């Protein structure tokens, strides 16, 4: 029942944030729409940002599990590669696009996402360092973890920023630039 209540609250919150904007929806609004007490919302989520990132722990467990729970015949690098490819597939889903568009719309959510990534990086560094195939140096372990998490960020960036990139690439394309007298295209 607790997990179902938590999931219901998170789904309602995400819908409200997406429909009305993150900054325009309060915890009381979420509680009212989810038909629970405000104290129930806070019993499940420590902050408003945590409502959006309700899968934070699951994501970290999946990253660490990609290293710790891989099959004996799979190398450390191949396990991380497979996890990154799963992330790329997820980032191309409509749900992901909507989610990351919401995150990009709020400075508070971007900040929370950055802090979350730092926690995930530390957990992944620990998992990599304790692996038998771990690189010899702590710096190499950290670099491998950072590369993996940066690949996640890069996978999501084109999707959430596509409208901005499309607009800037159109305005900077040769066809959209004013022509100089005597240039080849004006001849």
For the regions a protein language model found, what residue spans apply to each?
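Basic, helix-initiating cap at the start of DNA-binding domains
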Residues: 1-20, 24-36, 53, 62
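Hydrophobic/aromatic residues within well-ordered alpha-helical segments
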Residues: 5, 55, 59, 84, ...
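Short hydrophobic/aromatic patch on the recognition helix
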Residues: 36-45
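A secondary-structure capping/hinge motif
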Residues: 49-51
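Hydrophobic alpha-helical connector segments
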Residues: 61-101
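Amphipathic alpha-helical packing segments from all-alpha helical-bundle domains
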Residues: 107-133, 138-146
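C-terminal peripheral helix-coil segments that are non-catalytic and often amphipathic
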Residues: 126, 161-187
């Amino acid at each position: 029942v607790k997990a179902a209540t938590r999931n219901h609250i998170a789904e309602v919150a995400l819908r409200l944030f997406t429909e009305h904007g993150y900054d325009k929806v309060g915890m009381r609004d979420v509680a009212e729409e989810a038909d629970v007490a405000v104290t129930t919302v806070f019993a499940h989520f420590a902050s408003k940002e945590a409502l959006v990132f309700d899968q934070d722990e699951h994501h970290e467990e999946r990253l660490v599990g990609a290293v710790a729970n891989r099959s004996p015949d799979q190398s450390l690098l191949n396990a991380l590669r497979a996890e990154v490819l799963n992330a790329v597939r997820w980032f191309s889903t409509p749900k992901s696009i909507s989610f990351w568009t919401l995150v990009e719309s709020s400075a508070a959510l971007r900040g929370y996402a950055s802090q979350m990534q730092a926690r995930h990086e530390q957990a992944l560094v620990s998992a990599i360092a304790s692996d038998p195939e771990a690189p010899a140096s702590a710096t190499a372990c950290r670099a491998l973890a950072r590369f993996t998490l940066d690949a996640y960020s890069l996978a999501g960036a084109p999707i959430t920023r596509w409208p901005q990139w499309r607009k800037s690439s159109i305005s900077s394309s040769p066809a959209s630039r004013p022509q100089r007298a005597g240039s080849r295209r004006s001849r």
